[in-house]
């Protein structure tokens, strides 16, 4: 659904197939047209859970089955979709705030390209070493998308940037405050949680115009993953004593 809505808002989407387009009779031909490697993703998933990369068709068949099984167990929904895997990529997300009634603004970008197991480790704003014109175009697309959905509240629209082709594609929208929102708050000096509360209470003393949003700092957020390297990096949150 997100890909369909993105297309209606004229956002570029990564070449791929939706769940209803995946059928054995034509799958190999369609995937050949997309080009390998291909990423298999759960439609209901998040946080990189269950994502598989396939370098050829035989790997793809196996990855589809694995992802479906994991998605059913984790999310109660086995639907999947396929996307062209961008090998030399940057992962950029735009923080937006929508006011409904066809109006939204952005609070600049966060770079979350440094990842492990498809999960973000470093969040940074401004994004280093990327053309400002690309960031501006992403921001424009993000605002247009939120505006067309008459979106209300804070949200994040994520893009993948192909460094070889100098193109970017819509990935997904997170319709909530994310754990990395403090990065944006630091660089813009805007409390997004407070803003959400004030908007919900129909108060009017918060940032509501794009011209009022300024960025004057640089911020980096690092996530800590509690894992035990001696046990093949199994989760290791520590011993609960109380």
Which residues does each predicted region cover?
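A conserved helix-loop-beta module that forms one wall/lid of the active-site cleft
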Residues: 1-43, 50
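ATP-dependent carboxylate activation and anion-phosphoryl transfer catalytic cores
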Residues: 9, 42, 47, 54-242
